[in-house]
Structure formats: C-alpha cells, structure tokens
C-alpha cells in the first residue's frame, strides 16, 4: 500500500486533515463544518465565506475531505449496495407505505403537496412520532426536527398519536426539536444552523418543514420578485437535500397548491414553487380530500416508484388505513 493511500485511510476527522492549522479547523467547526462529510459536499465559495478563509484554502480542504471519503465514480453495483442501506419510516398506513415502497426514505427529500385539509400537517405530526419507534415497528429509534412556518404544530395531536402507539408521551415530546420560523430569512437561517445540531445529535433522523413555500410566497409576490424568490428557494432546498444525504436523514417538506386558470381539463391545481419544486425533491406525493376522513395519495414523481394512488384515513389515533 502506498504512503498516500495509507495517509488517506488515517484521515477520520477534520482534525486529521494534513496541512490545516488548528486555527482554521476551529473556524470550520464554528461555521458548522465539523465533519469530513459536510466539508466534502460544500462549495468552495460557501465554505470560504462561512469560515472566513481564503478561497484557495477552502478548495484545498474540500479536496482533502473528498479524497479521504473516497468520493469517486462508482459502479452501478456499488450504488445498488448503498441503496440497500437506505432506511424507511412507516407512515402508519400500510397502503401508503406500500405506495412508497416501505415508507419515507432517509437520504431523500419527500414533498407532500395538496390543498388545505388534505392531510399534509397530519402526516408531519405522525412521522415525527413514528420515527421514534424501533425499526421492527417501522421507526428508526430517532428524533425529529419540526420547522413550523404556519403555526399549525399541535402538541395535543402528538399526544394523541403517541398514546395510540403506547409510547411515553413526555419522552415523545422531548424527542421532537420544534421551532417556529417567522419569515423567509429566519427559515433559511434555521436550516443553515441545523448542520451543527444534527452533527452533535446523530439520533436526529427526520427533518420536517411545514410548509416550505408559505413565507417565500408571501414575501416575494409578483413576477418582478420571481427570480429572487426562486434563487433563494432553490438554495434552501439544496441545503436540506445535503443534510439528508450527509447525515442519513429523512427530509419531509409540505407545499401548497394553486389553481391554473389556463387548465381546461384534468386537475387544475399545481404545486406552488414552479420548476424549483418540480426538480429538487426526490419523491413528490400529491394529497387530495375524499369522503369523510379519507384522503388520496398519488405518486407524482419518483425515480424508483411506479405511478399509482392509494386511500388512507385521518383518524383520532393518527394516520391509518381506510376502512373498506
């Protein structure tokens, strides 16, 4: 084995990176780049600004981190083996889990979009509870981060869902990190700071943003603000995606819908956010109201899932299968 290969194998943390002073390492940690993984997926420009270091130094650090993690071209077989390690969180409905090939995936952003009352927030509450279940019961024995942009989080709902599953209510509440985002800049700052939280607490396995577009839509109205809005939203979504991929976390975002006046047949509603929202989430699920407590979930876009739809129910106990 060459000395170079041996040296790469010995790099386990950012403190092991060759030629990087402790002063620079401290700056990286203070900026939230505390692991090789976060450095490897950073852009030189962002790292340079965040840590207050020269661009050339940022480029060198990123290259060293990528070399240490052996980031390279992989065979399809290697990718398949990595996909086998993706974990899933049960939604509480076997039908909905079946539509999603087992549940909500880690390392992926899943978007639920639909009209008011279609079940988006109910799913977010349920998944924040279910992620805490042991793997044999459909969870990941993990914690959740809940970013609430519309003030719709209800601890009473969490309590009902936890009680129905026989879980200790106080423990369930204590395993959900909650924050209310008051505007777009606050929402973006929260996600930027999340990197530090999830690196310190590896038990976090779910991040919820409910809803991801409401502040952007309110603060950047009209076509004259569209370019700025989409640019900020795109960067925000990619930051969430990086967290999912680097820390093996499931990211759930909810989104609103709007009517298209130029649609004369079919469903006239489309998700807010335009092409930015069409392309960033790995899985897109549309939710619709049905009779009573029944809701319809339809796969709109997912590279590994066939098109299809199922019916599930919103019950007092939480998300469940709809009765025949």
Swiss-Prot record:
This is DNA repair and recombination protein RadA. GO terms for biological process: DNA recombination; DNA repair. It comes from the Archaea. InterPro entries: AAA+_ATPase, DNA_recomb/repair_Rad51_C, DNA_recomb/repair_RadA, DNA_recomb/repair_RecA-like, DNA_repair_Rad51/TF_NusA_a-hlx, P-loop_NTPase, RecA_ATP-bd, RecA_monomer-monomer_interface. The lineage of its organism: Archaea, Thermoproteota, Thermoprotei, Sulfolobales, Sulfolobaceae. ATP binds at residues 114-121. The gene is radA. It comes from Saccharolobus solfataricus (strain ATCC 35092 / DSM 1617 / JCM 11322 / P2) (Sulfolobus solfataricus). Keywords: ATP-binding, DNA damage, DNA recombination, DNA-binding, Nucleotide-binding. Belongs to the eukaryotic RecA-like protein family. Involved in DNA repair and in homologous recombination. Binds and assemble on single-stranded DNA to form a nucleoprotein filament. Hydrolyzes ATP in a ssDNA-dependent manner and promotes DNA strand exchange between homologous DNA molecules.
